[in-house]
Design a protein with these regions (language model features):
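Short, Lys/Arg-rich, polar N-terminal cytosolic tail immediately upstream
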Residues: 12-22
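Solvent-exposed, non-transmembrane interaction/regulatory regions
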Residues: 20, 24-27, 122
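Functionalized membrane-embedded alpha-helices
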Residues: 26-46, 72-113
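Perimembrane loop-to-helix junctions flanking transmembrane segments
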Residues: 53-70
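Membrane-interfacial entry segments at the cytosolic side of transmembrane helices
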Residues: 99, 160-165
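Membrane-embedded alpha-helical segments of integral membrane proteins
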Residues: 108-162
Length: 165
């Protein structure tokens, strides 16, 4: 004869296990989505680094910082490398925490920039994905908000779920 108390414990354990599996699924899905976005963005920009340089120069010009234009090529390669590296680190789990920090820092810089671009509309295209995918300024901002939410989720879940092996 089954004890009702044991049955409640079994149901509770099943609920806890399902909750853990759902959290694990969300963690890995978020990691793949953020990582793939950064890898794709870095890869597309790497195909045409001069195009990225010109886009950075456009941004510097509308912000009245054209005297930084000489550093646009260096900034282009730094951005390409940072995006691609952040994505690869998240996807491959080689150094997940570094990838999470790098993607967080990129989004801390890019989200306010895209909000300003969406409100003021100084450039027609953000250049997030080079010439492969052209997004409106507001679409870019909302894409960044989604990435921010996913990255916050990764920060919240990583302590409980992250296992490098």
């Amino acid at each position: 004869m089954l004890c009702p108390l044991n049955r409640k414990v079994e149901i509770r354990n099943l609920f806890i296990m399902a909750k853990f599996q759902f959290s694990t699924f969300i963690f890995h899905l978020s990691k793949l989505l953020v990582g793939a976005t950064f890898v794709f963005s870095g890869f597309v920009k790497a195909i045409d680094p001069l195009g990225t340089t010109y886009k950075i120069q456009d941004y510097l010009e509308v912000m009245h910082l054209s005297w930084f234009s000489e550093l646009a090529l260096v900034a282009s390669f730094a951005l390409i490398t940072a995006e691609f590296l952040a994505g690869m680190l998240l996807i491959t789990n080689v150094n997940f925490k570094l990838g999470l920090w790098l993607s967080s820092l990129l989004m801390i810089a890019m989200t306010p920039l895209t909000l300003w671009i969406a409100i003021k509309n100084p450039v027609t295209d953000c250049g997030c994905f080079g010439d492969a995918i052209i997004l409106s300024n507001w679409a870019t901002f909302w894409k960044n908000i989604v990435l921010d939410v996913l990255i916050i989720g990764l920060w919240l879940l990583q302590k409980r779920l992250y296992n490098p092996w």
